[in-house]
Amino acid sequence: MAVVAIAFVFFLSAMVLSVHAAVVEHTFIVSQVNMTHLCKETPVIVVNGQLPGPAIEVTEGDSVVVHVINKSPYNMTIHWHGVKQQLNCWADGVPMVTQLPILPNHNFTYQFVVSEQEGTLWWHAHVPLYRATVHGVLIIRARQGVPLFPKPHKEVPIIIGEWWGIQLAYADTTSDYNSASTINGKLGDLYNCSGAMEEGYMMDVEPGKTYLLRIVNAALLSEYYLKIAGHKFTVVAADANYVSPYTTDIIAIAPGQTVDALVVANAAPGRYYMVAMPNQPPKPDFQSPVLPTRGIMQYSNTEGRSLSSDVPMSPEMPDNHDTMVSFYFHGNLTSLHPRHLLVPERLDERMFITLGLGSVCKHDRLSCKRGDGSNESTILATMNNVSFHLPPVSTSLLEAYYNNPSNVDWLQELPDMPPQVFDFTDHSLIPTGPKAERLEPTSKAALARRFRYGDVVEVVFQSTSLMQSDSNPMHLHGHDMFVLAQGQGNYDMEKDVARYNLVNPPVVNTVLVPRLGWVAVRFVADNPGIWYMHCHYEFHLTMGMVALFIVEHGPTVNTSLPSRLLDLIGTANDHFLMHGQKNGIERTLGCAVI
């Protein structure tokens, strides 16, 4: 323990001595509180008693120290979404992959440096479903250099989320949905309790001033369209990477993504609705409730009259089934990066990954009807027709790997291609029909893919009808990805490679794979460790749409993962974060299936 303490003191001393850098320290107390919405009191897990949780604000190069005190009845970890954690995979916050979970009545300290990143990221729980209420914004400001857009009058975090009127520990992934959508934790006046409207988010503005909206989609289930009546956005960054300024009246943002957008208060003084509406594929895809929310952008009183009685102007929203709005929004983004990142031209690894749903037989049955949601089978989410399943382990995979890379040789390799090539976007497979039953049966495994340090990796994600035509926001921990191209239908290497943007593609940590379409990304495996790659739709994640990307140590000390400074206080035999399997849906808890 003395060695750990000395190491920690040395770590802090080194941070303080860094030129101009600061140590930003927070304490997160995770607890269960009761909140009342829609005439119902619900137990909710939150940080420091608030929803959303506290904002973390840093300057590029600063060090962050967060003490997590878990007073909730559930195990917990915190993931710093989009923070690259260079040479610091230990702080990534994935239970049983990078650390043991933080047990109730136990503590853990995260420490990391935010380097070579600027913009908006966020933090959230990385245990199933609880990121719905355990989340907050992480703001990174530039330390030096010429600003790439005018300095705003004010910065405003806008966190789009969901309100669940049930205890998330008991959510049924086949039939339970959120009760409302939220902006900064508020449901808004589209919802009421016995006729009394729910409180909505209010954004006060001054005429002529410019505001920087730091937008986060913290929702579990849906991509959202965001509009403000009578105003336009100028998008300047996505996932903490600058983009060429893009003017639009609507923002499409998928779960896990962040967008920085400027808004000028240049309309007539008054009140204007800010609407966040979830989108979803049209029928025959399964239809979930459409639950938009709205806040109000209100001009300050400049003429001596009250504006509170003004009827807010409403924006004209697209059809919630019009997913092409999202396709065009993401397709219009190009990078504008001060560090002049170059897209690597050489390729060391190329993968084609299909995203779908499948099923396995229950109770060790040798055969059952594929796609059957009855008691015969369990529905899974898959990558190349394999669903992630990690058996019980006694320590984190990262610790086992660090001690000896051969300790994780039992992990099954994620294949380069699906086991069977077919018309991936065949509409007759929505929902799973007779054709799907003739495809390769789904399997379960602890999926991983190893990369040498410095490998350039290209991945094409292909959406399939077996996903019931859902889009999929795919998030890679520890790395950013160049988004080279996206398209509708099936990917065709001979034709589609010619469409790649190798000059100024957007750079993201979470890329949306369009419904019944594909997206091609490229990244450099230059951060040693074991990194999660997964869908950020929560139910797809818990059902197994996960793989581990293992980046091997480089040839030098500066390209190899160092040892961790602090051990997690907890017991390895209590690594299951929740208990139960409901209605044929199997839930993968980050790394353990129960």
Tell where the protein language model's regions lie, with residue ranges:
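Histidine- and aromatic-enriched segments that form or immediately flank copper-ligand environments
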Residues: 24-149, 222-251, 271-289, 362-524, ...
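Cleavable N-terminal signal peptides of Sec/SRP-targeted secreted and luminal proteins
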Residues: 2-21
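Eukaryotic intrinsically disordered, low-complexity regulatory regions
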Residues: 177-190, 204-210, 216, 305-366, ...
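Extended recognition/assembly regions associated with phosphoester-bond processing machinery
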Residues: 261-264, 449, 459, 516, ...
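Terminal regions of secretory-pathway proteins
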Residues: 334, 344, 412, 494, ...
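Extracytoplasmic/periplasmic copper-protein system
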Residues: 18-20, 134-160, 286-319, 544-594
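Conserved small-residue hotspots that stabilize compact domain segments
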Residues: 207, 229-236, 243-246, 250-304, ...
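Acidic-aromatic/histidine active-site loop/patch
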Residues: 154-220, 317, 349, 356-358, ...
